[in-house]
């Protein structure tokens, strides 16, 4: 019995010690440091504090962050005027808390109410704004405003687009960190646009569920944002915070062509380094004005300087007639080989005709190509680009213009052959030059010709080592004679490619895809594309199924991020699938159906030449 009593006493002693230890630990967890009225939270005390204080606003910050430093005194002042604690977490130290609450930037404020949350703080960043936001939400009668961002699905998407003139749509994935960061800003923008009476509507699509919509709109990453105006889609290239979204979309809602009441307004509007398009109209109810306005809307993202005037003084200065629509070339790039402007005036003007006119004459004989204007001013082929230290700012203009004049002398000789010429800054396009093998060419001027065929023809630095005009003249003769060699971006061809799906790279594209003895189905993919990854197993399954029954059809794939394909195989999103039947290699057929095996079989059956004949069994 003595042993039993001693053993029992020992157990009791251990239990008491454990309880005291636990109590001591709890006391440590509830020991919070205060800094100017703000509670300092750490990974150790965070959960205990929230358990004791179920309503709290927490600021996640970084000591080096400028916005955090600006917010700090306002946050401290607000802490003494609100009815709940304000707390802060140094997320550069408490990294686990940062990961737990998916903190993407600084400062990020999170709000808990009655133990529920967190919700993102989207109020002001001053004392009054913080106090107002917090007190409104801790009010027992507070009800959050209804969500203004419309959730779109396959069922309601078309109606929403057709019923609203201007829409911004976000395609997102629930797991995407950037999407989560955008969400409160996007909703805040929608709320404020509504309050302003704006006609702009904001919508969102969960592209992981609405896969057909994602495919239709070329979604290859998240978030992807598209502007849809009167049914036509455009990429959204604006900011991703509320104020920026509001300003960008408000600008988008204004007429694309600016009204210029007086001559002085027109003069100020003229661009020094880009084309300016001015419509001269006696009245705004003419067919020409309507066509001009429609075309301006279609070209809103391409031409930022489009305006119209009715001022007689402006008509007189530029010798314009009513309904003249004039493209003015920037004075910086005038030359004696071309007019300073081009005029369009047709009795039955149409927006389609104007679009063609604008694009045909969107750049001077030799303008400056930049990353900003390359996709709008310099899409017409063949295009000859001369890369050097092209800087037309006042300090370096004379030297840059000297070399441009050399290019002009050659360019004017090829106007009749429809060649378009441009100069470009070699530093701005350093990556592109490196990809073409010209990153360390040793030449002061590098030249690349972008051909009709979609191929790129770099001037070989080992062959052309003279002066610019001499090199360019000789290289253009080589281009015209068809003797220049094209550069093809290509990953190494696989040494062992015995799988059911053939791997195509730039260097073996012609051999595999343009094989006239085979019909070829080719998928263009990106390694990071989720849709491509989910489709891969189905594609392999289809290839295996057809290997024995359809020996004259080849299923292939190509990583379009590291390989060049001919221009007729245009890739705008991932995955993109083309069918190149025998005899029709120059006109491949783009597949636009579901990524379903039976649908793909039907597609190939319909278009097959060497395969899927009537005698073949599916």
Swiss-Prot record:
Q: What is its main location?
A: endoplasmic reticulum
Please name the top-level EC class of this enzyme. Answer: isomerase
Q: Where is this motif: Prevents secretion from ER?
A: 615-618
Family matches, as Pfam families? Thioredoxin (PF00085), Thioredoxin_6 (PF13848)
Question: What Gene3D superfamilies does the entry give?
Answer: Glutaredoxin (3.40.30.10)
Where does the UniProt annotation place the signal sequence? Answer: 1-21
Q: Which PROSITE patterns match?
A: ER_TARGET (PS00014), THIOREDOXIN_1 (PS00194), THIOREDOXIN_2 (PS51352)
Q: Which UniProt keywords apply?
A: Disulfide bond, Endoplasmic reticulum, Isomerase, Redox-active center, Repeat, Signal
All copies of domain Thioredoxin, residue ranges: 22-139, 138-254, 480-609
The answer to keyword Disulfide bond applying to this record is yes
| Disulfide-linked positions | 65-68, 176-179, 529-532
**What reactions does this protein catalyze?**
Catalyzes the rearrangement of -S-S- bonds in proteins
Q: Where in the cell is it found?
A: Endoplasmic reticulum lumen
Q: Name one GO biological process term.
A: response to endoplasmic reticulum stress
Q: What is this protein called?
A: Probable protein disulfide-isomerase A4
